[in-house]
């Protein structure tokens, strides 16, 4: 039993070490590469900074409804991603696919959420970005 606990601890540490934290300008460059609308770029950066702290592997605390949020964009598993190994829900992805350093899958899902709900789908944006956005002019 002790061997399994140690193994799990080592694996958890190894997985966390692989996580990426974007710099603000690094995030802007990656979002541009993935085709995000330049006129909304400050909003996306603000959202990511307030939802995940720019960490690709962020898993949020359990929400009141029992759901969780995953990845850079903190995408919710109640509607958008499947907790299992089979892709599903509205983005047709697993939640683990949203936790990788390659954010292309997460970005596609985030764009889908935005198309349907705008930024109102994210509390991080609603609570922190409506009245002030980060300056990304140097990026």
Swiss-Prot record:
Keywords: Antimicrobial, Bacteriolytic enzyme, Disulfide bond, Glycosidase, Hydrolase, Signal. Changing residue 85 to S: In lysozyme-2 and lysozyme-3. GO terms for biological process: defense response to bacterium; killing of cells of another organism. Residues 20-139 form the C-type lysozyme domain. This is Lysozyme. Residues 1-19 form the signal peptide. The lineage of its organism: Eukaryota, Metazoa, Ecdysozoa, Arthropoda, Hexapoda. The active site is at 51, 69. It is an enzyme of class 3 (hydrolase). Disulfide bonds join 25-139, 46-129, 81-95, 91-109. PANTHER family: LYSOZYME C. Its EC number is 3.2.1.17. It comes from Hyalophora cecropia. Belongs to the glycosyl hydrolase 22 family. Lysozymes have primarily a bacteriolytic function; those in tissues and body fluids are associated with the monocyte-macrophage system and enhance the activity of immunoagents. InterPro entries: Glyco_hydro_22, Glyco_hydro_22_CS, Glyco_hydro_22_lys, Lysozyme-like_dom_sf. PROSITE patterns: GLYCOSYL_HYDROL_F22_1, GLYCOSYL_HYDROL_F22_2.
